């Protein structure tokens, strides 16, 4: 830091005075040496200390220098202490030590500020500690972050149809969502698609070639009817049928000639569903081979379940395009038609039917791939609000009968996003329309955009008909076995509060 400036006064301490004399005497001689060499001059120093001890320095020979001094008679510069003090005072040094670099190093206010700032910066850097590691986010394409430990992600690179409202890549910070639990039931739907949700029958046609990405958290229910209960999956990625181009069927268009595999993409991409991460049943559409020859049914309404607090976009207006409706493969045993209100939509629990309804003059309910009609999660999870005996066939042909006695089950579209694929596939023409009450209302607080109950013209939406019983026979061989699922008591909506 340099030498400290001292007041040029007599040092009272004897010891300090001796030390200072020794140091400065040598410094003076050093300066004389430098001056003699640099400027080619002769210098002689004669010093007597307080004890009258002589110390002398001469650049060459003291006698020669002294001889010149005695013989020199011309005017010359001669200074004393008073002269030096006066000169220093004029320079503003106030009699302090000479500002030679070797003699002192001054701490100017500017230097003090610099040093203090450097110290503060260094202290801040050291005290701040090492930067925290960034959180590890696992990016999974077209999956929705969920909190359910049963996180299964089904992906098939066959096609790239994705529901427009689904996040393309949602980061899953929870490691439990990255791998499916070993205990979950996972039956391969198609030989070519090992990552399919459990289903049997002819579901292989659609699932094997579709890009079915079930949102994480879609844990397979042990029921294993071919449907996946997407527990806490906010969104459902639309399943595209084999060779489907992911085309959304226009509003109120007749069933696609090819019976394109039904997707669950939203009919109206502008509709945004806010889905809380609570358990939501999901049923991936089954194979296209089972283009169900259901009658062109005018789905007047769907079961009106208790409105949930979940925010939902009302898609139940009579003019809504029926094509976006995803219907459960199982007809409701309930005999009455129910109106689906926007509040009810929040309760829809993504129980997407493998088939979709394209309502033309009478909404033709194409239930593609119902071969795997499995209420896996809904029955096991008790998510069916009004348990009804559903006669579902897991074989390629399904004979679904609705029993008037038992109330309809709550079926919900996982996210209500239905994208109907218009692919030229063999589909039986819609039979004469039969009014069939379809229950798509799920108890989970899912915001299902697919208003399964919205009729083609919106008529008869609000009039439940208790005396109506419409058994729906899906085109299947008569020898197909029906899977009878136990009716489940409808759960109260307070149980869905997360």
From Swiss-Prot:
Region feature (Disordered): 172-220, 240-268, 388-498
Q: Where is this site: Cleavage?
A: 174-175, 211-212, 457-458
- Which taxonomic lineage is given here? Eukaryota, Metazoa, Chordata, Craniata, Vertebrata
Q: Which organism is it from?
A: Mus musculus
Protein's name according to its UniProt entry? Myocyte-specific enhancer factor 2A
Can you say where in the cell this protein is located? Nucleus
Where does this protein have compositionally biased stretches of type Basic and acidic residues? 458-468, 479-498
Show the segment(s) annotated as Beta domain: 287-294
Region of interest: Required for interaction with MAPKs: 264-281
**Cross-link entry Glycyl lysine isopeptide (Lys-Gly) (interchain with G-Cter in SUMO), positions:** 401
**Tissue expression profile of the protein:** Widely expressed though mainly restricted to skeletal and cardiac muscle, brain, neurons and lymphocytes. Differentially expressed depending on if isoforms contain the beta domain or not, with the total expression of the beta domain-lacking isoforms vastly exceeding that of the beta domain-containing isoforms. Isoforms containing the beta domain are expressed primarily in skeletal and cardiac muscle and in brain. Also present in lung and testis. Splicing to include the beta domain is induced in differentiating myocytes.
């Amino acid at each position: 830091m340099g030498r400290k400036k001292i007041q040029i006064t007599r040092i009272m301490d004897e010891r300090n005075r001796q030390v200072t004399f020794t140091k400065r005497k040598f410094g003076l001689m050093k300066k004389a040496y430098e001056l003699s060499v640099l400027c080619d001059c002769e210098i002689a120093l004669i010093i007597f200390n307080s004890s009258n001890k002589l110390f002398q320095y001469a650049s060459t020979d003291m006698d020669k220098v002294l001889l010149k001094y005695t013989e020199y008679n011309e005017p010359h510069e001669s200074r004393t202490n008073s002269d030096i003090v006066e000169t220093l005072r004029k320079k503003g040094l106030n009699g302090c030590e000479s500002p030679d670099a070797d003699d002192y190093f001054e701490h100017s206010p500017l230097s003090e500020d610099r040093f203090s700032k450097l110290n503060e910066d260094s202290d801040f850097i050291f005290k701040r500690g090492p930067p925290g590691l960034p959180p590890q986010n696992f990016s999974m394409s077209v999956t929705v972050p969920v909190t359910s430990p049963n996180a299964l992600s089904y992906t098939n690179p066959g096609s790239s149809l994705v529901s427009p409202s689904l996040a393309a890549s949602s980061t899953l910070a929870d490691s439990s969502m990255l791998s499916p639990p070993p205990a979950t039931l996972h039956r391969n739907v198609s030989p070519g698609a090992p990552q399919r949700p459990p289903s049997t029958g002819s579901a292989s046609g659609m699932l094997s070639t579709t890009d079915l990405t079930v949102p994480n958290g879609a844990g397979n229910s042990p029921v294993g009817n071919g449907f996946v209960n997407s527990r806490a999956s906010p969104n459902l990625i639309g399943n595209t049928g084999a060779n489907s181009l992911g085309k959304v069927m226009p509003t109120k268009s007749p069933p696609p000639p090819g019976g394109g595999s039904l997707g669950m993409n939203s009919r109206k991409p502008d509709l945004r569903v806010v889905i809380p991460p609570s358990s939501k049943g999901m049923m991936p559409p089954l194979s296209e081979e089972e283009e169900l020859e259901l009658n062109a049914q005018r789905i007047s309404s769907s079961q009106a379940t208790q409105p949930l607090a979940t925010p939902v976009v009302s898609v139940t207006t009579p003019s809504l395009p029926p094509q976006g409706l995803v219907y459960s493969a199982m007809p409701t045993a309930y005999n009455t038609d129910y109106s689906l209100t926007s509040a009810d939509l929040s309760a829809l629990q993504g129980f997407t039917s493998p088939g979709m309804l394209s309502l033309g003059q009478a909404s033709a309910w194409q239930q593609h791939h119902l071969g795997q009609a499995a209420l896996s999660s809904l029955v096991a999870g008790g998510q069916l609000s009004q348990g009804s005996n559903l006669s579902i066939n897991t074989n390629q042909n399904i004979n679904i009968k609705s029993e008037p006695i038992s109330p309809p089950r709550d079926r919900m579209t996982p996210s209500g996003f239905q994208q109907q694929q218009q692919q030229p596939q063999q589909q039986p023409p819609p039979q004469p329309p039969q009014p069939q009450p379809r229950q798509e209302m799920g108890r989970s607080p899912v915001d299902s955009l697919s208003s399964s109950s919205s009729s083609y013209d919106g008529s008869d939406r609000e009039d439940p008909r208790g005396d109506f019983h419409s058994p729906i026979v899906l085109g299947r061989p008569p020898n197909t076995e029906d899977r009878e699922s136990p009716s489940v008591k409808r759960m109260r909506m307070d149980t869905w509060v997360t």
